[in-house]
UniProtKB/Swiss-Prot annotation:
SUBUNIT field: Homotrimer.
Keywords attached to this entry: Hydrolase, Nucleotide metabolism, Nucleotide-binding
Catalysed transformations (reactions): dCTP + H2O + H(+) = dUTP + NH4(+)
Active site: E137 (proton donor/acceptor)
HAMAP family: dCTP_deaminase (MF_00146)
Organism: Cupriavidus pinatubonensis (strain JMP 134 / LMG 1197) (Cupriavidus necator (strain JMP 134))
A Gene Ontology BP annotation from the UniProt entry: dUMP biosynthetic process
EC number(s) from the headed UniProt entry: 3.5.4.13
The name this protein goes by in its record: dCTP deaminase
Disulfide bonds: none
Similarity comment: Belongs to the dCTP deaminase family.
Length: 188
């Protein structure tokens, strides 16, 4: 299994629709101001956060249960900047839609710009033949409110291609998050 380069990422995005919309280079400025970068890097792709958020609140529940999650635990928010309360988290989604090839697995890591501020971005791997918008989790580990910027970079996706194609892909299994379009809550 080897990591894939910028050349491979560009080819797969442009010829096979692996990432849509796709940015072939690195974008670091918009409208004359610096932003958290996004687009193709040497061995990965920096994804952007869309402007749809679900901010966690503990007002309506007393326990978090991943097998029986209460959607009233979130407040919906739409905007260019999301403020995450201290020691809390928010869910969002990528601006990009992904179609992962059958021989590829991705790992997604948060950008250091956020990590250095105590904001952790968590995303699970994109499995072979998974497709959809990626649900992102932003954890604010600080005792202060934290900002997340929509339309800017938030995490980097690394693509690994196997020497042999898997026997059963995410699509073959009928994965529960296949084809997700909005910010998707946990499903048991």
């Amino acid at each position: 299994m080897s990591i894939k380069s910028d050349k491979w990422i560009r080819r797969m995005a442009e010829q096979h629709g692996m990432i849509e919309p796709f940015e072939p280079g690195q974008v670091r400025e918009a409208d004359g101001r610096k932003i958290v970068s996004y687009g193709t890097s040497s061995y990965g792709y920096d994804i952007r956060c869309a402007d749809e958020f679900k901010i966690f609140t503990n007002i309506n529940s007393t326990i978090v249960d991943p097998k029986n999650f209460d959607e009233k635990s979130f407040v919906d928010f739409k905007g260019d900047v999301c403020i995450i309360p201290p020691n809390s988290f928010a869910l969002a989604r990528t601006m990009e839609y992904f179609r992962i090839p059958r021989s590829v697995l991705t790992i997604c890591l948060g950008k250091s710009t956020y990590a250095r501020c105590g904001i952790i971005v968590n995303v699970t791997p994109f499995e072979p033949e998974w497709e959809g918008y990626v649900t992102l989790e932003f954890s604010n580990t600080t005792p202060l409110p934290a900002k997340i910027y929509a339309g800017e970079g938030c995490a980097q996706v690394l693509f690994f291609e196997s020497d042999e194609v898997c026997e059963t892909s995410y699509a073959d299994r009928g994965g529960k998050y296949q084809g997700q379009h909005g910010v998707t809550l946990p499903k048991a």
